Design a protein with these regions (language model features):
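Long, internal low-complexity/basic segments
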Residues: 23-30, 37, 42, 67, ...
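Formylglycine-dependent sulfatase
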Residues: 2, 8, 12-14, 18-390, ...
């Protein structure tokens, strides 16, 4: 494919200087275009080393622009990631981390409004997905499927900030429940049997098919990029438009989206500065190995527009008038939940080493997000492990409880399979990473440890400040809970007696961790009493704990029959966790009739339905085949998706 004039590089410094001076004299400001796509890891593009895919437009853009080699999304799920993009802050600071649930937040935290006040015309076509009840469209001049930088409402010389998001690579493209009727990807130059699979996924036909289908989507994204580059050229905008091209988080190969591994966090990100505006990036070009994350993009856009980023923004401007001179030493990421499974996890990296902290470590990573488990590869992986056919310990890791702390050497172990946290020679690195994360959750006032049902009816960000909430005490408890020892019992005993629900919950997590690890074997009466706690999250977590303390009948009965029907899914979350433990399955079997009734009679067509969760538990118990998880209704839907192909939209109107 020929290179478009947009990418022509000047060979003369004099021309570069004259263009810079001309821009300064006219007091011009650049247009800024974000072209975003979904669910795609960095390794899925040719310019990031993938030889199985054809991405000429992105490869060309990377060669002529700035290719970020260590760019992280803040979160491995869409809404939490986009909440960070739009605010320039970690989404946990505003309690916007739970996917995909909007909560009340301060109303003035979306940065495009500042651009509008500075004279920019701001458009979004059209996905928002910010986890805020504030009108997501309020910060844009236009926010719909017709919004365009070509709008007749934009002034003749008015600079624009335009965002286009395509869903062509979204997981929904391969969330087809089965592979029957799938297109022949070899017609697109993608050969499933020749693909190089990541070592953390099993080599199964469904895994290869899903990966091939997603690489087809990546090629479509590349074509979509080319359409915009041509439009900018045709309209004479290429010389005045800075482009950012990136994914919202990692991709659709299993153990990617939703997980704080590199496969879920490291995104392809390319920035292109036309010669006229290259001085704003200090002439930078080529591969950038520094650490970058989504909190940096909002401040960067403001800085490029000549607007000083507000002090409350936690990211750093990479380029422009207010570019930060500080080098980022470490960067952070977060995950809050897998659908109904509340399981906060945090991560930090210095580029070489990666630390993942699971605050409820007995919650397996394989707990199902029932949307993601519509991918045939996830179903096939479940069948391999749960059916007892797996012989590779690496492929079983996500099905088991994991250490509260994990440490990986990304240089030697890019697939993050070999945990170094227990190896003495890495003790100093482990300590440094642990301390960096501990400091981070405190300096950012991380609200992600508050229960989902405690975030409604108020603006949590303001409530904790107004009431001088004991956040430091909470963080200390949270850190102890996942690594509790018998020496922690006095703190845990105090916590479960607290009038504050969040303290009771994390106290229970500490007891559950001790019980799961066989560090205690008798059930305290105060813990047993929490089966009747008015907060269903506390009652369900207590029920999980007492099952391991000789009270299986009482605990499982509480999980099977909630105090209120609306809380059933919370109990099923803990029950699913138990059902992945082979030693606990016989304790659940006396309740099979109740589970089968729920699986048959409760709603099961939507990802959040309790009937679907009941079916998942039955699968774990060996009482249902994984292929029947979503029911017969899903088969026809899958056929239609396998025959079809997502459109490359939106386009520059």
């Amino acid at each position: 494919m020929r290179h478009l004039p947009l990418f022509m590089c000047t060979a003369f410094c004099g021309l570069y200087s004259s263009q810079t001076e001309a821009a300064d004299k006219k007091n011009e400001r650049p247009n800024i275009l974000w072209l975003t796509f979904e669910d795609t890891s960095a390794y899925e593009f040719g310019c990031y080393g993938n030889g199985d895919v054809h991405t000429p437009n992105a490869d060309s853009l990377a060669a002529r622009g700035i290719q970020f080699m260590n760019a992280w999304s803040v979160a491995p799920q869409s809404s939490a990631a986009r909440s960070s993009l739009i605010t320039g802050c970690y989404s946990s600071t505003y309690g916007m981390d739970i996917h995909p649930v909007p909560y009340d937040t301060p109303a003035d935290i979306f940065f495009p409004q500042r651009l509008r006040e500075a004279g920019y015309y701001c458009t979004n076509n059209s996905k928002t997905h910010y986890n805020s009840t504030t009108d997501n469209k309020s910060c844009w001049d236009e926010c719909n499927n017709k919004a365009s930088y070509n709008s007749t409402k934009r002034g003749k010389d008015q600079p624009f900030f335009a965002v286009y998001n395509t869903v062509t690579s979204h997981m929904g493209r391969i969330r087809t429940f089965h592979t029957d009727g799938r297109r022949d990807y070899t017609q697109e130059g993608i050969f499933p049997q020749q693909l190089t699979l990541p070592s953390y996924v099993p080599d199964l036909p469904e895994v290869r098919s899903d990966y091939a289908g997603h690489l087809e989507a990546v090629q479509d994204v590349d074509t979509w990029l080319g359409i915009f580059l041509k439009d900018l050229e045709t309209r004479g905008l290429e010389d005045n438009t800075i482009i950012f091209f990136f994914s919202d988080h990692g991709g659709c190969v299993a153990r990617g989206k939703g997980y704080l591994y590199e496969s879920g966090l490291k995104v392809p990100m390319i920035a292109y500065f036309p010669p006229k505006w290259r001085h704003l990036a200090n002439g930078a070009k080529g591969k950038e190995n520094g650490l970058v994350n989504f909190t940096d993009l909002g401040p960067t856009v403001l800085s490029l527009a000549g607007v000083k980023p507000p002090k409350n923004m936690q990211g750093k401007a990479l380029y422009g008038k207010f570019a930060s001179k500080e080098k980022r030493e470490v960067q952070f990421a977060l995950a809050a939940n897998q659908l109904h499974h509340f399981m906060p996890v945090r991560a930090v990296t210095d580029g070489r080493f990666k630390y993942i902290r699971s605050y409820i470590p007995y919650r397996q990573f394989a707990l199902r997000n029932y949307y993601q488990w519509g991918m045939p590869s996830n179903k096939a992986w479940d069948k391999l492990v749960l059916g007892g056919h797996n012989t590779n310990p690496d492929w079983k890791q996500t099905f088991e409880p994991h250490p509260a702390e994990m440490l990986f050497d990304l240089e030697k172990d890019p697939d993050e399979l070999h945990d170094l946290s227990a190896i003495p020679e890495y003790a100093e690195t482990l300590y440094k990473m642990r301390q960096a994360l501990s400091d981070h959750i405190r300096t950012t006032h991380d609200l992600g440890f508050f229960l989902p049902n405690s975030r409604t009816g108020h603006i949590l960000y303001e409530k904790v400040r107004k009431e001088k909430y004991p956040l430091d005490e909470l963080y200390g408890l949270v850190e102890i809970a996942g690594t509790a020892t018998v020496a922690s019992l006095p703190m845990l005993e105090k916590a479960i007696a607290s009038p504050l629900p969040v303290m009771r919950f994390w106290g229970v997590v500490g007891y559950a961790n001790l019980a799961r690890e066989n560090q205690i074997n008798t059930c305290p009466q105060a813990l047993l009493a929490l089966l009747q706690d008015e907060n269903p999250y506390i009652a369900s977590e207590a029920a999980y704990a007492v099952v391991y303390l000789g009270k299986a009948q009482e605990g499982i009965a509480r999980l099977i029959t909630p105090a209120q029907e609306k809380d059933r899914k919370i109990g099923y979350s803990s029950l699913e966790c138990l059902s992945l433990d082979p030693e606990m399955r016989d304790y659940i079997r006396p309740f099979l009739s109740e589970l089968k009734e729920a699986a048959e009679n409760l709603p099961r067509l939507e990802n959040e339905d309790a009937g679907l969760m009941a079916r998942g538990i039955l699968v774990n118990l060996g009482e249902m085949d994984i292929k029947d998880l979503h029911g017969p209704e899903a088969y026809k839907k899958g056929l239609k998706l396998n025959y079809g192909r997502r459109a490359m939209v939106p386009l520059p109107n």
